[in-house]
């Protein structure tokens, strides 16, 4: 799921950034929450870290980009779990703190970023839900922007349907265009691969 969704988001981001006057010749870098819970971990609560992931470059067909993104995601997981103990959690907290300080000082736009977009995938209910007998037709995620971020794209699954929520800063205009591009990229990937 992540490979397909990120391939569609990647293609859509390149098209969107080009359209609003910020063409990107390199892979788009995103921040991606990573589950840090190990199989033998019996502690309660969430254990998350943020990994920086370079998606695919703008060249190549969708299937090549899909394969490249899948390779990069596997590498990220291997790197995250090769770090001892809770080092990755501590690294995430440190980066978040630095981002907040840079935002407060007004420097976050003047220094190279750590990926100005976060993309997360939140698993939702696998079966339909009902409220007082009425079926809940859709569930959309509501997200926020952490310091240093320009955009947050959250995927939320509900009863075998994937919904996207997109929030961004005011300078990221025409988010509906980005949403339309994500859908178009999915349809094209599906058409190309049958």
Regions found by a protein language model. Give the residues of each.
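Low-complexity, glycine/alanine/valine/leucine- and proline-rich hydrophobic stretches
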Residues: 113-187
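Helical lid/core segments from catalytic subdomains that handle acyl or acyl-like groups
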Residues: 42-125
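Hydrophobic "lid/gating" helix adjacent to the active-site nucleophile
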Residues: 1-42
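A generic structural motif
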Residues: 1, 38, 54-60, 168-173
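Conserved structured core elements
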Residues: 2-7, 11, 26, 45, ...
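Generic recognition of flexible, low-complexity loop/linker segments
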Residues: 17-20, 104-107, 140-142, 151-154
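Generic, well-ordered alpha-helical scaffold segments in large soluble proteins
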Residues: 7-19, 54, 72, 76, ...
């Amino acid at each position: 799921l992540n490979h397909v969704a990120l391939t569609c988001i990647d293609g859509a981001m390149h098209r969107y950034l080009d359209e609003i006057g910020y063409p990107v010749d390199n892979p788009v870098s995103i921040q991606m929450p990573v589950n840090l819970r190990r199989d033998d971990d019996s502690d309660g609560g969430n254990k998350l870290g943020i990994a920086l992931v370079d998606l695919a470059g703008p060249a190549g067909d969708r299937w090549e980009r899909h394969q490249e993104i899948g390779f990069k995601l596997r590498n990220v997981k291997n790197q995250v779990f090769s770090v001892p103990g809770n080092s990755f959690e501590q690294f995430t907290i440190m980066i978040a703190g630095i981002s907040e300080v840079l935002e407060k000082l007004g420097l976050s736009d003047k220094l190279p970023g750590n990926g100005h977009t976060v993309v997360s995938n939140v698993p939702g209910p696998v079966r339909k839900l009902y409220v007082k007998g009425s079926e809940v037709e859709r569930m959309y995620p509501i997200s926020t922007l952490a310091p240093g971020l320009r955009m947050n794209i959250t995927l939320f699954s509900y009863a075998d349907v994937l919904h996207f929520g997109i929030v961004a800063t005011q300078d990221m205009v025409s988010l509906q265009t980005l949403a339309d591009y994500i859908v178009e990229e999915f349809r094209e990937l599906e058409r190309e691969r049958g």
